[in-house]
Amino acid sequence: MNSYESRGHLLTEQVNPQSQNLDQMSALELVDLFNQEDQKTLEAIANAREALAQAIEITSEALMHGGRLFYVGAGTSGRLGVLDAAECPPTFCTPPELVQGIIAGGAGALVRSSEDLEDRAEDGKKAIAQRQITELDVVVGITAGGTTPYVQGALIAAQQRGAKTIFISCVPAEQVPFAAAVDIRLLTGPEILAGSTRLKAGTVTKMALNILSTSVMVKLGKVYGNRMIDVAVTNHKLHDRALRILQDLTDLSREEAAILLEKSQRRVKIALLMHWKNVDASEAEHLLKVHQGSLRTALKS
């Protein structure tokens, strides 16, 4: 799509008939309208469930074999990718290089609008080259309207390097086709404020990324039951959470849980294995290494 071609046919650019009198609504009417329209994000996720599941399987398999996960986007889409990537280390104790967000314009674009930079496909290609992406990696391109040159350039470059690619967009495939290993279409319809894809499109994208990254970490053994057993204990809140996880799963007192946590060097997964298998920290580490970090599998050994 060139710079002179109309984008009015795109679902994300169309006018929402429910908000034609937006500027005349009361505050309560505005809240009700947003609430009504946001219900469509749930339906969009439900309709994309099979594609999301496929993305989870492909990504978890890649990361199990030494790959990395990259999100690529511009504007709101880029910021959402960076946000999701940034949450992985504290939540799952992953190294920062395992899940990375790439945004057109770099770090500065996180706080200052840099929309013009999204038109440079060559910059997207350079971003892929700079990170030395290989066939082991997974690259997720996020573009609400589907046409962002920066994102498409990055995905094409990633494909040329053999990486698995996932395309996330909020327009139908017939409007903007793109050949990727997984094609996720999150169709929430026209925005309340016409063309403002930071609204429903942004919300549904955040939902999809939450599902993708969390589910991948579940597959990687970062979770036991529904507890974040690989949480990075880096502040008072997370220290408290770690203690409560140990208490809940072991029936230890808070004081006993605190002693166990310190013996494990503040690693909840290690602490649990030490307690349940009656081993020291080094033996617990060895067991987890043998069983690819899976606490449940290590417990069965």
UniProtKB/Swiss-Prot annotation:
Residues 59-222 form the SIS domain. The active site is at residues 87, 118. It catalyses: N-acetyl-D-muramate 6-phosphate + H2O = N-acetyl-D-glucosamine 6-phosphate + (R)-lactate. Pathway: Amino-sugar metabolism; N-acetylmuramate degradation. The keyword Disulfide bond does not apply. It is an enzyme of class 4 (lyase). Homodimer. Specifically catalyzes the cleavage of the D-lactyl ether substituent of MurNAc 6-phosphate, producing GlcNAc 6-phosphate and D-lactate. This is N-acetylmuramic acid 6-phosphate etherase. It comes from Picosynechococcus sp. (strain ATCC 27264 / PCC 7002 / PR-6) (Agmenellum quadruplicatum). The gene is murQ.
